[in-house]
Amino acid sequence: MLRRALEEKYALKIGEIRTTTAVICSISTDTILDFEKQCLKPHCTFSKPIINLGYTYYDIPSEYKEELNESIAVNHRIDAYALITTFDETPIESIEPLISNDKSEIKWTFLLDWTELHQGTWLRFLSKQFESLESKGYDLKNENISVWCMNSDYMFELQKNDILWESFHFEYLQQSLRSVLFYRNGSLIYVDKKRNQLPLFEIFVKLCLHNRNDKYKSLNQFTEMSETSQVFIPFNSDSEDLIKTIDEEFQPEEVLKPDFMPTFEKVIPYSKPKDEPHLPPIGELPHFDMNKELEEAAIILKQASKKEAYAKQNI
């Protein structure tokens, strides 16, 4: 009788595994490895990537099951997939056959990295990922997305060693990210590996599980907005007025306009990656067309000659 009652209550058979799918997307393998090291438990390591795909899982312990109002007899697991993306799209097709959840239930984690991808491209990168996934029927507006900015401690190095970066730029960047996520009902996290005091793994788990129970619809106990490099702003906790407290002249609704992104890209200074990329193997060197290069050089010289002749005529 007890077994039948539990099965009816939870719409599952005892021993059946209830899964939540989380997809962690990044343009860089190194950033995914940083996320694994900084934000996951030691035993939650991604399997050796097959091409651009990694996998790990986490079985929910009993204390979480009690909060979720689930029977301890019900097995609950987070299936986490690490996916290397291109700049323009998320190749979700590689894991679609493995996903058991409805498209509207998948939890999306997008990784940005202060030491990798140029910060001025962040909004365009996110926009392209969102568009790519939404065109395939995935829901990225229903508390299902979070953006994790890894290695945010690098901000201090930029501020100290790069004369182009000023406090305004860091504030403008954060306000822009917060605004994008505010209108999508998403969450923002800055991960400072040197100073971090946020319970990153717990945040990740609860972001994955929040829609199982109303208790998970409030992560405000972890909210952190005051620290420059340690930020956690969960969905439903931000507002236009809060975003404007950083700089009241910033208008959050501007991020919804087509001309905001070009403005953002002009405002944010270029900063080269912390580690210069290695030269590609000889077999992967880009094609060099000598004739094309000579033709382009000839055009440039011809234009320069014309300008010089014109200048002499007008002396």
From Swiss-Prot:
<keyword id="KW-0243">Dynein</keyword>
<comment type="subunit">
    <text>The cytoplasmic dynein is composed of at least two heavy chains and a number of intermediate and light chains.</text>
</comment>
<dbReference type="GO" id="GO:0005737">
    <property type="term" value="C:cytoplasm"/>
</dbReference>
<dbReference type="GO" id="GO:0005874">
    <property type="term" value="C:microtubule"/>
</dbReference>
<keyword id="KW-0206">Cytoskeleton</keyword>
<comment type="similarity">
    <text>Belongs to the dynein light intermediate chain DYN3 family.</text>
</comment>
<comment type="function">
    <text>Component of the cytoplasmic dynein which acts as a motor for the intracellular retrograde motility of vesicles and organelles along microtubules. May play an important role in the proper orientation of the mitotic spindle into the budding daughter cell yeast. Probably required for normal progression of the cell cycle.</text>
</comment>
<dbReference type="GO" id="GO:0030286">
    <property type="term" value="C:dynein complex"/>
</dbReference>
<keyword id="KW-0505">Motor protein</keyword>
<keyword id="KW-0493">Microtubule</keyword>
<keyword id="KW-0963">Cytoplasm</keyword>
<protein>
    <recommendedName>
        <fullName>Cytoplasmic dynein intermediate light chain DYN3</fullName>
    </recommendedName>
</protein>
